């Protein structure tokens, strides 16, 4: 209802979803078509729309409001944007929304593929939290137990409701959206993306940059889920090698050194 009330007072830009990426091309399209005297940006859509919106809001020093239409990822309330700039995937400073309007009646009816991508993005947090703890043990990096507890509780709730979520049950879809927003808030609380993006996201960044592959017709959460499985297998291999005494962690001296 709020969006309907202000719709007539807004300039509306609809970006073609086909091949849309958070990159300079998309930024240029928006900048070439938006009015000069904007004082607020409404991001109505999923993850890519939000990355583009928060990046532009940061550059133009205006606030933005998040209106997620699908529970497809955890990037709705972060303070960084995942952008492909000059062929390189980067996490760049941006702004968090001043508020979020997530209508259950809308996002619970989103295409199942988008919702499944959100579940996948969330389940990869198990890898992120493990990575974070390892970094804490090896390098002394700050590790927030309270933040981890909040994320683990949300993960447990969603994990037990996956079937209901895929069937569009509103209460369970709300829990998924809550968990995704919480993941974004965790990044705000810590001041970086450590609680939500680690080894598995590094793999997806290489895919996004097409280092050894062509364009992929895959959603972010879909790529994250595959990457999480690949990372998990590699971690199992490393763990076995450590147990068997075939490799060990070196004392941490500086960030430029290889740790294994």
Q: PLM ranges: what are they?
A:
Residues 33-36, 57, 90-95, 99, ...:
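Solvent-exposed alpha-helices and their adjacent loops that cap or buttress functional pockets
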Residues 59-157:
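A glycine/threonine-rich phosphate-anchoring loop and its flanking beta-alpha core
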Residues 148-260:
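Active-site segments that bind and position negatively charged phosphate/pyrophosphate groups
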Residues 1-40:
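ATP/NTP phosphate-donor binding region
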Residues 13, 42-44, 65-67, 102, ...:
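General beta-strand structural signal in soluble alpha/beta enzymes
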Residues 34-56, 60-69:
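A short, small-residue-rich loop immediately preceding and capping a beta-strand
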Residues 44, 73-77, 218, 222:
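Active-site histidine-anchored catalytic micro-motif
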């Amino acid at each position: 209802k709020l969006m309907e009330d202000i719709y007539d007072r807004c300039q509306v830009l609809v970006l073609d979803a086909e091949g849309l990426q958070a990159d300079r091309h998309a930024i240029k399209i928006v900048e070439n078509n938006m009015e000069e005297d904007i004082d607020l940006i409404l991001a109505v859509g999923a993850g890519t729309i939000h990355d583009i919106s928060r990046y532009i809001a940061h550059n133009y020093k205006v606030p933005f409001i998040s209106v997620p239409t699908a529970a497809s990822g955890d990037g709705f309330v972060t303070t960084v944007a995942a952008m492909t700039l000059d062929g390189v995937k980067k996490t760049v400073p941006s702004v968090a929304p001043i508020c979020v309007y997530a209508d259950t009646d809308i996002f619970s009816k989103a295409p199942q593929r988008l919702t499944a991508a959100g579940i996948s993005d969330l389940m990869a947090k198990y890898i992120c939290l493990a990575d974070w703890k390892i970094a804490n043990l090896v390098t002394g990096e700050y590790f927030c137990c309270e933040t981890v507890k909040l994320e683990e509780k949300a993960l447990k709730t969603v994990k037990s409701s996956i079937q209901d979520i895929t069937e569009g049950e509103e209460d369970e879809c709300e829990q998924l959206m809550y968990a995704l927003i919480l993941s974004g808030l965790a990044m705000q609380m810590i001041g970086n993306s450590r609680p939500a993006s680690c080894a598995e996201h590094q793999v997806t960044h290489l895919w996004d940059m097409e280092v050894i592959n062509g364009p992929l017709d895959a959603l972010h959460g879909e790529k994250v889920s595959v990457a999480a499985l690949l990372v998990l297998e590699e971690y199992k291999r490393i763990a076995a090698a450590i147990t068997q005494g075939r490799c060990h962690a070196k004392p941490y001296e500086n960030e430029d050194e290889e740790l294994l």
